[in-house]
Curated annotation (Swiss-Prot):
S-S bridge residues: none
Chain positions recorded as UDP-N-acetyl-alpha-D-glucosamine binding sites: 11-13, 123, 164, 194, 295
Protein name from the UniProt record: UDP-N-acetylglucosamine--N-acetylmuramyl-(pentapeptide) pyrophosphoryl-undecaprenol N-acetylglucosamine transferase
Record keyword Magnesium present: no
Membrane association type: Peripheral membrane protein
Length: 377
């Protein structure tokens, strides 16, 4: 079968769908090698996947600050040189990039050697890397309804985000038992994506006594480097114990989302895809400094589809009231869950796998048989 390179590191939003795609390719007998960045979040997440082959590539994020810009240019140059050697040695049938600062090297190296390239953009506003690299792509996968003028004619395919096989709803009772939360109380899960969100962490610290007083348990995933693992016991108005838990990282996403009655989170595309798959209603607080304001666009679409509600970061003072209104409204929660089930009908992973195989057949490229190669960047 064929070899594929998948560029998908730097954030959980890139890495998770890359892993999902790599597993799908392996299941079909293809070879996969994952190229990842040097960031801590990549190292933490890949520890669960010893069967996949990960390779770190040089790269740092873009910045207009003179020192960081110089570093960006330097690491991009090293990354391009590294990827030229990688593509020459691997002889892939195709390269897939999920965006981010490590995509350029492998995409350009592939094009120089005539290897077909597919790009996947998960957000409803395409990022800089996807916009720039789309002119070199044979396929550009975009969320339904999103357009990209720079993409070659006929290259765009509507596509959702591939989700890892283990991301699926499980029994709420079993999920709560795993984390030690009571079944008879409401549970709010708070997290800011793979890198955490200080604003949400601070909100939990400030509001946890009031939430506990109403009988709402909280599990807050702070993000690496943004606190330490900690459990606090508070009381309801009636004196019953309420568990408040802080975790720096959680690699049990299906159990965590299944345990929750409601999630309070940022609005990255990866987070939203996992909420949809686990059918967990959410209050989304878009990160206002996200590139091209893509989180606000993601959140607005999620709200229009009926998966939850959106609160702007400038309105954090109103979030506690919003949480309490939603989390105790069983009819509204049922409505949200039904809408999330409807949103999850399309199997994006299978659709993408089929199209990638068609792309490589049409292009006529042939890779060496063996393992699937996923490049996590």
């Amino acid at each position: 079968m064929s070899t594929f390179l998948i560029s998908c590191g730097g954030t959980g939003g890139h890495l998770s769908p890359g892993i999902a795609l790599a597993e799908g390719l392996q299941a079909r007998g293809h070879s996969v090698r994952l190229l990842i960045s040097h960031k801590k979040v990549d190292a933490r997440l890949i520890a669960k996947y010893p069967r996949l082959d990960f390779t770190r590539v040089p790269g740092t994020g873009f910045s207009l600050h003179p020192v960081r810009l110089a570093r960006f240019i330097g690491t991009q140059s090293r990354g391009l040189w590294f990827c030229r050697g990688l593509v020459r040695a691997a002889r892939p049938a195709g390269v897939v990039a999920f965006g981010g600062f490590t995509s350029a090297g492998v995409v350009l190296a592939a094009r120089w050697r005539g290897v077909p390239v597919a790009l996947h953009e998960a957000n409803r506003v395409p990022g800089r890397a996807i916009r720039v690299l789309s002119r070199f792509a044979n396929r550009v996968y975009l969320p339904p309804g999103v357009r990209l003028a720079s993409a070659p004619p006929g290259a765009v395919r509507p596509m959702g985000l591939p989700v890892r096989q283990e991301i699926r709803r499980v029994s709420q009772t079993d999920a709560r038992a795993r984390f030690g939360f009571a079944v008879g109380q409401k549970l709010l899960v708070v997290f800011g994506g793979s890198q955490g969100a200080t604003v949400l962490n601070d909100w939990v610290r400030r509001e946890m006594p009031a939430l506990a007083a109403e009988g709402v348990q909280v599990c807050c995933v702070t993000g690496l480097g943004k606190g330490s693992d900690e459990t606090v016991e508070l009381r309801t108005h009636a004196g019953q114990p309420v568990r408040i838990q802080f975790l720096t990282f959680c690699d049990c996403v299906p159990e965590l989302l299944s345990a929750a009655d409601l999630v309070l989170s940022r609005a990255g595309a990866g987070t939203i895809a996992e909420l949809v798959r686990c059918e967990t209603p959410a209050i989304l607080v878009p990160f206002p400094q996200a590139a091209d304001d893509h989180q606000r666009a993601n959140a607005a679409f999620f709200e229009r589809q009926g998966g939850g509600v959106v609160v702007e970061q400038t309105m954090m003072h109103s979030v506690r009231a919003e949480v309490l209104d939603v989390i105790f409204d069983e009819e509204l929660l049922r409505k949200f869950r039904g809408n999330l089930q409807r949103m999850d009908r399309a199997n994006s992973l299978e659709l993408m796998l089929n199209d990638l195989e068609e792309m490589t057949r049409t292009h006529g490229a042939s890779g060496s048989p063996g393992t699937a190669t996923a490049v996590v960047t």
